[in-house]
Regions:
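Membrane-embedded alpha-helical bundles that constitute the cytochrome b-like, heme-associated redox core
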Residues: 1-165
Length: 165
């Protein structure tokens, strides 16, 4: 179906589309992913979380989910910047060989790191029952929300009660 040459040609363009998609997500969700005191409490109690105990008054996203968000954004920015530097024949001639070599190493590191983040994200989603539905279909049951994200559950319920008045 495809050739290595075609993959090499398409790779940078697919990367730009991927980056643009994540930037849209960034502007949509950044304010939900700001780290607060409750997140620090969550992180300090990671051992309890690993054995499926709920800790803290978690909002829409827990500390782990926020870390995935920020890591994805940071690694995608690194991929974009390094990718532009190594993008032949368009931009690479503007940079020295040492800069291109550094960009290649940075690009490889950021790609592997992002893949690891995505794998951890998928594993965690499989680990916590009901999370795959949230990721794939975009909704969760009220009992799931109440158990895993109690502050967010209360906020949504308050909005529903106000809108029904």
């Amino acid at each position: 179906l495809g050739t290595p040459q075609l993959a090499r040609i398409l790779h940078p363009f697919v990367g730009v589309v991927m980056f643009a998609s994540f930037i849209i997500m960034f502007f949509r969700y950044w304010h939900h992913n700001l780290i607060n005191r409750d997140d620090i409490f969550w992180a300090k109690n990671i051992r309890k979380i690993v054995v499926n105990e709920e800790v803290g008054d978690t909002g829409r996203y827990n500390f782990g989910q926020k870390c995935v968000f920020w890591a994805a954004i940071i690694f995608l920015v690194l991929l974009l910047v390094s990718g532009v530097i190594i993008w032949r024949p368009y931009f690479a001639p503007a940079f020295s060989i040492p800069v291109i070599r550094f960009a290649l190493m940075l690009h490889s590191f950021a790609a592997v790191a992002l893949i690891v983040v995505i794998m951890v994200h998928i594993y965690a989603a499989l680990w916590v029952k009901g999370t795959i539905t949230a990721m794939v279909e975009g909704w969760v049951t009220s009992s799931w929300a109440k158990k895993h994200h109690p502050r967010w559950y209360r906020e949504v319920r308050q909005k529903q009660e106000k809108s029904s008045e």
